[in-house]
């Protein structure tokens, strides 16, 4: 059985036991997170939400809170002596999917 959930402005296909990386969620390591924005549940009998499946939830456990590798953002304007260098590290949350309840 699998499901498609919405979190952090993205849609992610998940299965039980899968490890996923999502945009940062509030919670400490070991906390249980419940997603109620389930768009689709697949398996023996597929359920499509309009826009979400009624009563369907996905539970996951927080494994890690971290930050991605640094990206360098560099801006410049030619002939104007304007240079700007900036770094960015996007925070993320690593989850392990426990169960899909439909």
From Swiss-Prot:
GO cellular component, one term: ribosome
Gene Ontology biological-process annotations: translation
PROSITE patterns in the record: RIBOSOMAL_L21
Keywords assigned by UniProt, alphabetized: Ribonucleoprotein, Ribosomal protein, RNA-binding, rRNA-binding
Family: Belongs to the bacterial ribosomal protein bL21 family.
HAMAP family for this protein: Ribosomal_bL21 (MF_01363)
Quaternary structure note: Part of the 50S ribosomal subunit. Contacts protein L20.
Protein's UniProt name: Large ribosomal subunit protein bL21
